[in-house]
């Protein structure tokens, strides 16, 4: 797959959270080829609750894997992965991104359960990255769980049967009147933006857009297949990113500083601490990251080889190919949980909501 982006949360009707527990172990370099200037980055990869299904939603989960390297203990850099030449164990499929920043690893056939793959190999073209054959190199392999969203038409907005703020709609004539209906995205072609029948439009009352158009064909609309993140960014994933940065970069992206929670102490389950001159740590590695400013988010995505998702892609990921429901949330209906959650195994990889409710979304807000 070629399109990558971040999704803060995607639960799609799940009644409880299952920890991802994605792990990369036993990283090594092997099979150096000094003629062509490449080596193989070898590692083991595992995660829980994996699936692939060819009917119904026809989707699967995957790991987005990328490599960072440094030469002689200097700055960490992003490794260039070759389109071909990698190796996968039985039952695994490898798809390297067109921009060579990383690769997707996923099931090659339908199935469910936990993944545990050993001796996965990616071909790193180190000479393309300006690394000498005899350089002393450190490498790190990072992995993020993703979900494949297949190509399909879908609807945005809920039309006259909802009262969302600044939602998408299209006008449809009903006798002497015009009604607001959901707008169907049926291709990646340019979309006309206008307050007219058959066009996409939206109000602009609360930090909305400029209502200008058209939306160009090159803009990701969600019709074509894409990947999105399965879970929120965890505190452990953030630390993995943060600890590869320079001192100056860390100071500008410090969630313990004035632009974040402004303390090394725990606040709202954020236990990230960054002692001066050291590496950041957390005692809640599996808990989602909070105190995230937009510039923090964009820096993490750029470092990961990902991009922000578009609003159109977000609605496709939540709704799929189903018809619109008035006032619906991301889980497909207008019901929200009306009580404070309690947890089992709080703070552990197998943490779960003990009282999720039935037919309600995983949210409590005012």
Task: Identify the function of each model-found stretch.
Residues 80-83, 88-110, 158-340, 351:
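Active-site microenvironments of metalloenzymes and redox enzymes
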Residues 57-86:
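Extended low-complexity, serine/threonine- and proline-enriched intrinsically disordered segments
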Residues 37-41:
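Structural beta-strand segments of beta-rich domains
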Residues 279, 288, 341-366:
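Active-site Gly/Thr loop motif
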Residues 4-13:
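Sec-dependent N-terminal signal peptides
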Residues 44-57:
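Short amphipathic, basic-aromatic surface patches that mediate peripheral association
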Residues 15-19:
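Sec/Tat signal peptide C-region and signal peptidase I cleavage site
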Residues 95-153, 160-164:
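Acidic, Ser/Thr/Gly/Pro-rich low-complexity segments and short DxT(G/T)-type signature motifs
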């Amino acid at each position: 797959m070629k399109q990558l982006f971040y999704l803060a949360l995607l639960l799609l009707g799940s009644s409880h959270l299952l920890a991802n527990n994605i792990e990369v172990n036993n990283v090594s370099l092997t099979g150096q080829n000094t003629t062509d200037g490449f080596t193989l980055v070898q590692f083991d990869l595992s995660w829980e609750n994996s699936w692939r299904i060819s009917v119904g939603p026809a989707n699967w989960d995957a790991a987005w894997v990328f490599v960072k390297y440094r030469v002689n203990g200097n700055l960490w850099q992003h490794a260039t992965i070759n389109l071909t030449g990698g190796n996968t164990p039985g039952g695994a499929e490898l798809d390297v991104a067109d921009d060579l920043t990383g690769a997707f690893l996923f099931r090659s056939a339908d199935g469910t359960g936990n993944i545990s793959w050993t001796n996965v190999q990616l071909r790193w073209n180190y000479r393309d990255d300006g690394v000498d054959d005899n350089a002393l190199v450190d490498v790190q392999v990072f992995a993020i769980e993703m979900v494949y969203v297949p190509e399909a038409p879908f609807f945005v907005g809920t039309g006259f049967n909802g009262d969302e703020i600044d939602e998408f709609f299209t006008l449809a004539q009903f006798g002497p009147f015009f009604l607001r209906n959901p707008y169907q995205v049926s291709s990646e072609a340019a979309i006309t933006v206008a307050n007219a029948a058959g066009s996409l439009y939206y109000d602009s009352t609360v930090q909305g857009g400029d209502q200008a158009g058209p939306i160009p064909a090159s803009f990701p609309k969600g019709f074509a297949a894409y990947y999105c993140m399965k879970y929120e960014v965890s505190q452990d994933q953030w630390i993995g990113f943060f600890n590869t940065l320079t001192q100056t970069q860390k100071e500008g992206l410090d969630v313990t500083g004035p632009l974040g929670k402004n303390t090394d102490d725990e606040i709202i389950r954020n236990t990230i601490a960054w002692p001066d001159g050291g590496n950041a740590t957390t005692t809640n590695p599996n808990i989602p990251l909070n105190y995230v400013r937009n510039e923090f988010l964009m820096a993490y995505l750029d470092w990961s080889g990902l991009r922000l998702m578009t609003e159109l892609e977000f609605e496709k990921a939540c709704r799929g190919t189903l018809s619109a429901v008035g006032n619906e949330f991301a889980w497909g209906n207008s019901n929200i949980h009306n009580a404070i959650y309690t947890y089992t195994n709080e703070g552990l990889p197998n943490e779960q909501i003990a009282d999720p409710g039935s037919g309600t979304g995983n949210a409590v807000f005012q």
